[in-house]
Amino acid sequence: LNTDAVVTLNDVKVHYPVKEGALQRVTGHVKAVDGVDLSIARGKTLGLVGESGCGKTTLGRVIAALVAPTGGDIWMDLSAQQQLDVNRLRDLSESEMSTTDRDLWKQLTLNNRLGSMSKEKQRQFRRNCQVVFQDAFSSLNPRQLVRDIVGRPLRVHEQLSGEELDRRVIELLEKVGLGAEHLLRFPHQFSGGQRQRISIARALALNPEFVILDEPTSALDVSVQAQILNLLVELQAEMGLTYLFITHDLGVVQHMADDIAVMYLGQIVEYGPTDQVFDNPLHPYSRVLRDSNPTLEGERNRDWELSGTVPNPIDPPHGCRLHPRCPVAAAACGWSVSDALSRTEENSPVLFETIKTIERVDDFNAQVAFDNEDGARAFVDQLTNSSMNNAMPIPPTVSGSSVTLAFNEVKDASLEQIQKDRWSSCIRSQENGLLPELVKTPQVNEKEGQ
């Protein structure tokens, strides 16, 4: 780390409890954000991309202190040296710290850690971090005039009123391409693009350093999107703003962002400079997202495609979380008993219905009993012809109407540096330094032969 960071995240988690039954017992947790490490450099734009439901909006709300994390730390305004100090001290127990270290840690937590700051520091954070939401119409009070909407932060934090307040509001409106004639109108009297400009004006009212943009253009027409994006670029250059730009549109990120963080199933799977991630993705998910984005030359090669559906965030896959859907998944990527069962349920629902019992030893070993021996043999044939076959040190064996499963136990994939300024959680990229080539082989149709 060689630059100051507006925001630094260490192992941030947001887990929502799942409650069932009359007594509402907790039976599991939805891992919306699961162990995110991230740093946003001052004056830069970080693009946070991923499919709907990957956790990117939740992560943005956590950074804005609108949602409390269930684990990890969020640090504000750390210098490069302070980031090094935090990384060194955060895993030490108090007994392992020297007196100097303890004093430094106390100072860092009181001044820079969200949740431990003094009230004055929290108030300062509220001023310096603002959010522009996706749906401008629902984020603007329909009963208030533009003057009241944009002027509220000025009344609360700077205690302005009267002509001075109106003058500041008009200045903000003019900054975003509106004017005094819009001061006494309600939100419903504006177009979608104009409402988003009002949201931006409100976010800029207190001269923040950091703005979180949560899909600010996704609800707008393409021509209006371009106007808003150009406005955001101009404002950043004029005011020295730092942006976290959350979107599912890679074309927008390519235009806006200095760096990209790709998010899948609650985790960051790739991070790096925008041009490098587009030119040479180091994670299969990034490659699929990039290739699905149309260009002026037409669509890219679509050989890289994901299979199946997004796994359950209550029980995410072991190893690399993409491996059940990945076109280049290998034995080391983290197959488990749950993968074998979910693959069968998805591709052979009739066969899945013949399963009588499942006796799990652990996540990687189990005994699966079927109604008859034919079902057990069909299950083994399906596993043998699938990409998870090489992940089993002992081939699945049939004993009567039961099948014994044994997979290699693997640890969960983590984000690791692969190249200069490039990080990826792809296990195969970590082994080779590059994304593996896609080898197209004739695929066995698992639905046939049921």
Show where each model-derived region lies.
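Conserved ABC ATPase "signature" region
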Residues: E163-E181, R290
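Conserved catalytic motifs of ABC-family nucleotide-binding domains
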Residues: N207
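Charged, flexible cofactor/metal-binding loops and thiol motifs
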Residues: K19-Q24, R102-Q107, N111, T274-S425, ...
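P-loop NTP-binding/switch modules centered on Walker-like glycine-rich loops
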Residues: A65, P216, L220, V224-R302
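Conserved ABC ATPase signature
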Residues: F186-F190, Q194
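Conserved ABC transporter NBD signature motif
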Residues: G72-V86, D91, T99-N112
